[in-house]
Amino acid sequence: MTELVTKKLVIQEEQVRGPWHEAWSSFKKSKSALVGSGIVAFFVLIAIIGPFIVPQGINEQNLTLRLQPPSAEFWFGTDDLGRDVLSRIVHGASISLTVGLSAVLISAIVGSFLGIIAGYYGRIVDTIISRIFDIMLAFPSILLAIAVVSILGPSLQNALIAIAIVNIPSFGRLIRSRVLSIKEEEYIHAARAIGMKNKRILWKHILPNSMTPVIVQGTLSIATAIIEAAALGFLGLGAEAPQPEWGKMLADARMFLLNAPWAMIFPGIAIMLTVIGFNLMGDGLRDAFDPKMKN
């Protein structure tokens, strides 16, 4: 009798635990995902509280201390204008994370909207939107971003817009394929049969069941967006002086690589660690939400 009650309780517990709970349990078991989450959390914390605790001002120049190696006073050394590299990296974290998160949020919203419309309504709407995505994906993302910034003009804001635009097709095609699968489910046909309007079907059934791949793709896309922002900054098409954006810091320090490698190495390490963190976290989310893709 006791064994039957125990089995019944186990079955009831499994029924209560939804897919989000299962995904979270799987995510916590992944060491690489936890490491990635820890790295991301560290840089987010640095971006929030770092500017209040750094020892030097980001634009505080002292030419008598230019190109100083790492020391007790300047942990990461100084750049060609005598500015503290550590302080600028800390302030740059908020810039890079803001650009990455904002660009991905914009591209996810726009791309998801277009993907849902294309996948659900099909026909000429699907053809037009899909062809636009194909044309955009025919170009390397960084090349397309450079073209957009060249039209809008070099600035951090325009770089953010360019990065958002070039990432729209990846979200759009992902959601479109998801919607094509979902709209053939029986509960969608049942909703149509009882007279439910398309807008309600999209909002109540299609959209909630399409969010899982968006979350995974969004996490991975943040890493790509940070790299693209750094690349645009390095090329002089993103952040402008004296903004301490990591890519801009690399560009300013490249002329002094042999004499002061620390001015270029430390911003590069910051970019690398942030990208690795988001990639590991994204891989963990993908494995948690879709265990079939783990191998």
What role is predicted for each listed range?
Residues W75, V85, I109-G111, I116-I182, ...:
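Generic hydrophobic transmembrane alpha-helix motif, especially the helices
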Residues F43, I116, A145-S150, A159, ...:
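Transmembrane alpha-helix boundary and packing residues in multipass membrane permease domains
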